């Protein structure tokens, strides 16, 4: 931050008239200087509150300090004593402990004990003869003015350390120290008539005066000698109070005092010459101070004045102070922008706010340590709404930090503290007295949004300031002529010097205004260029971002498409695999179903065949048993019949023997004529059982058995006549035995021989029955197999025909697809068509197939009926194809 050294001289052309700036040597003691400045600048209006003289205006209360400081730091500061005691230079001039506490009782001293004000007996209007008022002892203790070093006499300026504003005007307004010492006048003797004399502290103003200043004279009669004039730089201490309290001091103009003292009994309109009757450029001043934010910075900042000096700031209808005439705003207060005049010769009402140090309170404890040397950060500006039909100066023009040529040398700690104080004061409460809220507190605008408007508003403000300055100059000339008649001669020279300084100041202001405008234009051009560059950079970044996003989007889409295609391929492959597996599974299931069906059919056929064989065996066994029983019954019957026949034959033989005995003589005599070896021809008696036996045909052995008794018959023929009878009997009994075909007992046969012959006969019968049963079983089995083949042929023929469709006579096709019709257990290995190109390979594969599916081979391997049927059919088809192949191809 910049210090105050030379700041007014650089920006406004004001230079002190006293000795050379004593502040230059006190740059290190910045804290003490700032405290002195704050105390002198804030509480100058309260210096004469306890004087015996009456205030200029109607006070709202006897204790005006409470009203003045009730909103500021929680109560009024303690007052000076009337005695001329002075504090040590090391003690701070601003008692913060007292300011931040609640106000105390009336009886106790509530004002802080400041350093003894310098040049208490000097008046800012000392050079005006008519306003020179003798000061009493009660008026000696006053608050130190901000420009005490300017307004005080050079002699006193040497005696005591001045305020930090000694060097504020820059080499004492450009005048030499010798000139100031010779003239011995105040700093503003040549600037404004009467602006250098010692005056009493500012007096309070009534509420009526704040509302209608044009109807009442701003000052009372001459009897209020102690409170006739106010310090022109303490005007904004009245704006520190809000609507809750009236303003505590009147803001008067030295030029206005000139006219008022020349014609005290005249009307207010006659004093102003009918020009400024209804015009109050500071109409809203004193009603409300700017809002303070958390950092103590206001939204308003004086234009071109970083040192914290007074300057008009547009409040846009939010700062409605008490009605003060145009004379209250004068150039000794560094007003570089006077309001312009309208067409009818009167000034327009202005909402300019005069910021003073009294409105810049400190919330930090004072310290003697130097502040940090780093520059402050730039503050964002906030536009303020304009009042309707009133010209305004945007605050952005005041907030802009305009660089100047003299800024480089202003870097002392005192200026840094004052800049912080200025920033802190800008953030105060901006709620107007009429209840309008601060428009800047609720809206945020861009830093560069009001740059163009700021330049135009600044130019308008400069034009108004020029018009105001010219009018003030004319008024001062007229008032000075009136006042010069009753003034002393030495004031004329001071007035001329002030006029010269005023003209020089005007020239400097014009030059500085032109420089500021040029710098502002350059700054605006730079800002526009920076904004354009920033906009271009943002556009380029946006284009790059869009291009990058497009590339990323295209890449992402390509990746998504590739992933989708890969996923689709994988899905298709998986579906193909699943389909193949399903088809294979279906084929295997069909084959298994066919095999199971074939097995079930074979098992059923086998069961049926076994059942039929068992039934056939049972039937055969039953028949054999029946036949054997019948044979045994017949044999028993034959034996009984034979026994009966033998009995009858024996009886007949006996009868015949007796008869033959009677004829022995005949046989005796006839024996010589017929040899005994020739048997006699006899007629054998018929056997009643012979026909039935031969008709049965059950025994084939009946034929050979019929020849058995031939032997004994022949023997009987050869025997003698005695033996012939026996032979005849044997033949009689042997004939039936040979005729029966069963086992017959032979007379004279031993028991062993008879048993052996019976066993042999039984074995023969058993073998014959067994052979017959086997033959019958084979025939039955063949019949069952044929029936089963006929049954399963309906199912298997369909598959075989489907397999051989289109392959009739094509041996290669049949051999390459043979695995689809054969069962897995046959041992056939699939063969590809590429292996069946040559005739030799076809012949070789055909031989293998023949060995695998030949019906006899299949029968030997224990195949079932279904497999046998398939083998027979396939073998027949292969044989036909082989015959065709063998006839067509040579190999």
Curated annotation (Swiss-Prot):
| Residues of the J domain | 826-891
Q: Per its UniProt record, what Gene3D superfamilies does this chain match? A: DnaJ domain
**What's its job?**
Promotes probably uncoating of clathrin-coated vesicles.
Instruction: Indicate the segments annotated as coiled coil, or none if absent.
Output: 454-666, 749-793
Disulfide linkage: none
Source organism per entry reads: Arabidopsis thaliana
Keyword Cytoplasm attached: yes
Region labeled Disordered — which residues? 68-94, 148-538, 555-720, 732-764
**What does UniProt give as GO cellular component?**
cell plate; cytosol; plasma membrane
Q: Where is the composition biased (Polar residues)?
A: 208-227, 392-417
Residue span of the signal peptide, if any?
none
Put simply, this protein is called Auxilin-related protein 2
Source domain of life is Eukaryota
Query: SUPFAM superfamilies annotated for this entry?
Result: Chaperone J-domain
According to the UniProt entry, which residue ranges have a biased composition of type Basic and acidic residues?
174-184, 460-538, 555-568, 579-647, 751-764
Bias-annotated ranges (Low complexity) = 648-660, 667-680, 696-712
Biological processes, Gene Ontology terms: clathrin-dependent endocytosis; negative regulation of clathrin-dependent endocytosis; negative regulation of endocytosis; negative regulation of growth
Pro residues bias: start-end ranges:
368-381
What residues does the R domain cover? 606-627
Source taxonomy: Eukaryota, Viridiplantae, Streptophyta, Embryophyta, Tracheophyta
């Amino acid at each position: 931050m910049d210090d105050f050294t030379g700041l007014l001289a650089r920006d406004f052309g004001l230079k002190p008239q006293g000795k050379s700036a004593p502040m230059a040597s006190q740059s290190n003691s910045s804290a003490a200087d700032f405290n002195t400045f704050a105390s002198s600048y804030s509480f100058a209006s309260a210096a004469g509150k306890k004087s015996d003289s009456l205030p200029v205006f109607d006070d709202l209360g006897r204790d005006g300090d409470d009203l003045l400081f009730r909103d500021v730091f929680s109560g009024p500061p303690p007052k000076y004593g009337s005695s001329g005691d002075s504090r040590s230079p090391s003690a701070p001039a601003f008692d913060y402990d007292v300011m931040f506490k609640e106000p105390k009782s009336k009886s106790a001293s509530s004002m802080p004990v400041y350093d003894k004000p310098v040049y208490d007996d000097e008046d800012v209007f000392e050079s005006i003869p008519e306003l020179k008022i003798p000061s009493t002892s009660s008026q000696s203790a006053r608050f130190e003015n901000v420009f005490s070093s300017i307004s005080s006499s050079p002699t006193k300026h040497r005696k005591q350390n001045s305020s930090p504003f000694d060097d504020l005007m820059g080499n004492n307004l450009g005048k030499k120290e010798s000139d100031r010492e010779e003239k011995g006048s105040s700093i503003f003797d040549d600037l404004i008539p009467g602006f250098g004399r010692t005056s009493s502290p500012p007096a309070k103003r009534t509420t009526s005066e704040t509302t209608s200043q044009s109807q009442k004279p701003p000052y009372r009669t001459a009897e209020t000698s102690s409170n006739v004039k106010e310090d022109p730089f303490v005007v904004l201490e009245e704006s520190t109070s809000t609507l809750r309290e009236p303003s505590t001091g009147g803001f008067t103009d030295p030029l206005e005092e000139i006219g008022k003292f020349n014609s005290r009994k005249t009307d207010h309109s006659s004093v102003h010459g009918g020009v400024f009757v209804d015009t109050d450029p500071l109409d809203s001043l004193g009603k409300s101070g700017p809002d303070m934010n958390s950092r103590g910075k206001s939204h308003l900042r004086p234009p071109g004045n970083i040192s914290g000096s007074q300057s008009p700031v547009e409040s846009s209808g939010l700062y409605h102070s008490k009605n003060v005439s145009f004379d209250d705003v004068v150039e000794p207060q560094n007003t570089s922008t006077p309001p312009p005049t309208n067409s009818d010769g009167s000034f327009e009402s202005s909402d300019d706010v005069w910021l003073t140090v009294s409105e810049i309170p400190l919330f930090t404890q004072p310290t003697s340590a130097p502040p940090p040397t780093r520059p402050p950060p730039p503050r964002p500006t906030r536009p303020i709404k304009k009042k309707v039909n009133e010209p305004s100066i945007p605050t952005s023009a005041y907030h802009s930090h305009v660089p100047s040529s003299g800024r480089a040398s202003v870097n002392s700690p005192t200026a840094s503290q004052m800049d912080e104080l200025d920033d802190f004061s800008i953030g105060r409460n901006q709620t107007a007295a009429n209840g309008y809220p601060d428009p800047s507190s609720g809206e945020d605008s861009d830093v560069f949004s009001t740059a163009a408007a700021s330049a135009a508003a600044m130019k308008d403000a400069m034009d108004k300031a020029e018009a105001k300055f010219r009018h003030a100059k004319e008024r001062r000339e007229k008032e000075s002529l009136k006042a010069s008649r009753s003034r002393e001669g030495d004031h004329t020279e001071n007035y001329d010097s002030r006029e010269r300084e005023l003209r020089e100041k005007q020239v400097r202001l014009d030059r500085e205004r032109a420089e500021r405008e040029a710098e502002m234009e350059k700054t605006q051009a730079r800002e526009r260029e920076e904004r354009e560059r920033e906009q271009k950079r943002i556009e380029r970044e946006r284009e790059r971002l869009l291009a990058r996003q497009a590339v990323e989007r295209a890449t992402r889409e390509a990746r998504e498409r590739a992933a989708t295609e890969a996923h689709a391929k994988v899905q298709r492959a998986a579906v193909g695999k699943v389909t193949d597996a399903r088809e294979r599974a279906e084929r295997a299931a069909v084959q298994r179903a066919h095999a199971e069906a074939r097995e079930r059919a074979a098992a059923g056929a086998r069961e049926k065949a076994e059942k039929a064989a068992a039934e056939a065996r049972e039937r055969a066994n039953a028949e054999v048993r029946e036949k054997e029983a019948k044979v045994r019954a017949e044999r028993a019957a034959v034996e009984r019949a034979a026994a009966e026949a033998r009995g009858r034959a024996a009886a007949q033989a006996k009868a015949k023997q007796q008869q033959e005995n009677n004829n022995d003589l005949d046989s005796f005599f006839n024996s010589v004529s017929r040899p005994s070896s020739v048997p006699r021809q006899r007629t054998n008696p018929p056997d009643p059982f012979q026909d039935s036996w031969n008709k049965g045909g059950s025994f084939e052995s009946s034929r050979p058995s019929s020849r058995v008794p031939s032997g004994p018959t022949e023997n009987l023929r050869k025997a003698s006549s005695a033996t012939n009878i026996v032979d005849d009997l044997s033949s009689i009994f042997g004939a039936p035995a040979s005729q029966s075909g069963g086992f017959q007992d032979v007379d004279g046969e031993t028991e062993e021989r008879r048993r052996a012959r019976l066993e042999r006969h039984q074995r023969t019968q058993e073998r014959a029955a067994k052979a017959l049963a086997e033959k019958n079983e084979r025939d039955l089995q063949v019949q069952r197999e044929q029936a089963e083949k006929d049954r399963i042929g309906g199912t298997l023929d369909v598959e075989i025909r489907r397999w051989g469709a289109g392959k009739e006579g094509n041996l290669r096709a049949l051999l390459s697809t043979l695995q689809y019709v054969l069962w897995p257990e046959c041992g056939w290995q699939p063969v590809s068509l590429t292996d069946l190109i040559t005739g030799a390979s076809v012949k070789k594969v055909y031989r293998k197939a023949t060995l695998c599916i030949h019906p006899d081979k299949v029968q030997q391997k224990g195949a079932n009926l279904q497999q046998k049927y398939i083998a027979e059919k396939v073998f027949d088809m292969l044989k036909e194809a082989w015959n065709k192949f063998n006839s067509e191809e040579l190999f």
